[in-house]
Design a protein with these regions (language model features):
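Surface beta-loop-beta hairpin patches that serve as ligand-binding interfaces in beta-rich domains
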Residues: 359-406
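Acidic glycine-/aspartate-rich tracts in secreted/extracellular proteins
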Residues: 74-76, 94-96, 366-370
Length: 406
């Protein structure tokens, strides 16, 4: 009797295990089918400057979630576009296609391209000549969603990229160039103008040739500005190189930040100018090379404490300060390893070789940035000309001030 029961239970267990295996196999087949269907559903639409194979308007009207639109080389004149609530990648193929506004007002959307929600990636495109009747014409204007801009150029636009207030929006800019602000007296045209969004990340990018406006202006709750060349040129006429008027959680690491002799403002990095900060406010500034071409003293970094909460935290370590000026005077916080220098102490400032010259007394003079309180502020990369980054070797035990460890 016991033997019979053992056989019965063994058979039941074997059938149960087989059923489970069959169920799992069926689930895997179903998932594979769904993934295959999704992969097959994603399409690549090709656009040409003369409208063949498709025009940009036609491609945008046909595109579905997950699709890619590829632009052939050439100039796309008056190719205004609205991208709404989709997952979409638009990339240039080969030589960077030019999206041209021709220096004329761009209509109701005040941008060459308007990104309205969704998850959008723009790659290998150039936006030039955006204008609007109110002076706020943008190459790309973001109204919500997540936008990634990668390997794109923005020249001669009233705003290169303009992100409007939306506390859930995110903007990422990688390996791009923003420059040549229109020379309009009183225009205040910023190369990058970011409203009160959730997060801004900028890396491996170059900002140059501003005029009266700022190179970077961000009111984001979190601003990560790392490994960029934010340098207006020796005769540049921008105002602030970086302005963070609403405070927030700001990380500024590994950048070259240069202010031209014709700048209308001697402050290079400004934090908290609005008096309307976020609920959490921390400024981390590490391993930047600040360069002032003015004869009068610069104010390399200014924290507007009067408009910030009492618990605002400021940490600045291992920055290289080239030229006459002030850095931490009057600013609350922790400062260490920041070193003054003149251009002659650099390898070759005239050719933008801003690393310390061989034999400099400042080589290896920085503090260990991996142990600043409970934070690791060590740079993981360096800006690599003309755009992009170069990873630093792991295992470093000595640190030099500034954006370069060469």
């Amino acid at each position: 009797m016991q033997a019979a029961m053992n056989v019965m239970f063994w058979n039941v267990g074997r059938r149960a295990r087989a059923a489970r295996r069959a169920g799992a196999l069926g689930l895997l087949v179903l998932l594979a089918g769904l993934l295959g269907t999704a992969a097959l559903a994603a399409e690549t639409l090709v656009v040409g400057p003369e409208g063949t194979p498709l025009s940009l308007t036609a491609a945008l009207s046909q595109a579905q979630d997950g699709d890619t639109i590829e632009l052939l080389p050439g100039e796309y004149r008056d190719a205004h576009a609205v991208l709404e609530n989709r997952r979409l990648t638009i990339r240039g193929i080969g030589k960077r296609p030019l999206i041209s506004g021709g220096g004329k007002p761009s209509g109701t959307h005040k941008a060459l391209w308007l990104v309205r929600g969704g998850e959008v990636v723009l790659e290998n495109l150039e936006f030039r000549g955006a204008r609007a009747a109110d002076g706020e014409g943008a190459g790309v204007r973001q109204e919500g969603g997540r936008l990634v801009v990668r390997r794109c150029d923005f020249f001669d636009n009233e705003y290169g990229v303009h992100a409007l207030n939306d506390d859930r929006a995110e903007l990422t800019i990688q390996d791009s160039v923003l420059g040549m602000a229109p020379k309009v007296v009183g225009g205040l045209h910023h190369l990058l103008n970011v409203g009160r969004i959730a997060r801004l990340s900028v890396s491996g990018s170059r900002f140059q040739q501003g005029f009266e406006g700022h190179l970077i202006k961000s009111r984001a709750r979190e601003s990560l500005i790392r490994y960029n060349f934010i340098h207006d040129g020796q005769r540049g006429g921008a105002s602030y190189e970086i302005e963070l008027p609403a405070g927030g959680l700001a990380t500024v690491i590994g950048n070259v930040i240069g202010q031209g002799a014709d700048s209308q403002n001697r402050v290079m990095l400004a934090y908290g100018t609005d008096g309307r900060p976020w609920d959490r406010n921390t400024l981390l500034v590490a391993h930047n090379t600040f360069i002032s071409y003015k004869w009068t003293p610069a104010w390399f970094m200014r924290v507007f404490s009067d408009g910030l909460p009492a618990d605002t935290e400021v940490v600045a370590v291992n920055n290289l300060l080239v030229g006459p000026g002030l850095f931490w005077l009057g600013a609350p916080g922790y400062f260490d390893g920041n070193r003054p220098a003149v251009r002659g102490m650099l390898r070759d400032a005239d050719t933008y070789a801003f690393e310390l010259a061989p034999g400099s007394v400042w080589h290896g003079s920085g503090i260990d940035p991996r142990q600043v309180g409970r934070r690791d502020l060590s740079p993981q990369a360096e800006f690599e000309w003309p755009v992009g980054t170069r990873a630093l070797e792991a295992g470093r035990t000595t640190w030099s001030p500034g954006a370069y460890q060469r």
